[in-house]
Amino acid sequence: MATMSLAAASPLASIPRGIAAQAPCAAFLSIRLGGATATRFAGLAVASQPAERRAAAMVAMAKREQELEEIRAMTTEQMEEEVVDLKGELFLLRLKRSARQEFKNSEFSRMRKRIARMLTVKREREIEQGINKRLSRKLDRKWKQSIVVRPPPSLRGNKEE
């Protein structure tokens, strides 16, 4: 009775190593270079992004740049006040969600991103002043402990009326 080893049964065992590495892959259909797509089959060419989508992305980027300019124009104290107000608004949104009241779901990400941008600019300023990470965290802890809890701007307007 003849025994057959697994190496002999393998389909790659009979193909020399250099030839097996050069075998074409059937899954390869196209290469994307910049905006153009070079395909193996002309009928499978994928259309580039629609012009409307690109235009919308450009508008969003311009708004983001404008918002960053506004944030950079603020003083550090104004930024800290704004962060406290935005965190209060975020808390109110969470309350509305838990109470199943009507709210805009997109406001969550918008506010969180604005808070993150402000804190990033604040940290950039600290780096310019030469404050290291450890001291920055220490100052941040002190700042958080010194925050006076107050209602966010949206509730302040309701109380005055």
Curated annotation (Swiss-Prot):
GO cellular component: chloroplast; ribonucleoprotein complex; ribosome
GO molecular function: structural constituent of ribosome
Superkingdom classification of source: Eukaryota
Transit peptide: 1-61
Keywords, in A-Z order: Chloroplast, Plastid, Ribonucleoprotein, Ribosomal protein, Transit peptide
GO biological process, one term: translation
Pfam families linked: Ribosomal_L29
Principal location class: plastid
Gene3D superfamilies, A to Z: 1.10.287.310
TM ranges: none
Subcellular location: Plastid, Chloroplast
Complex and partners: Part of the 50S ribosomal subunit.
PANTHER family assigned to the protein according to its UniProt record, in alphabetical order: 60S RIBOSOMAL PROTEIN L35/50S RIBOSOMAL PROTEIN L29, LARGE RIBOSOMAL SUBUNIT PROTEIN UL29C
Family to which the UniProt record says this protein belongs: Belongs to the universal ribosomal protein uL29 family.
The protein, known as: Large ribosomal subunit protein uL29c
Species this protein is from: Zea mays (Maize)
Upper taxonomic lineage: Eukaryota, Viridiplantae, Streptophyta, Embryophyta, Tracheophyta
Gene that this polypeptide is encoded by: RPL29
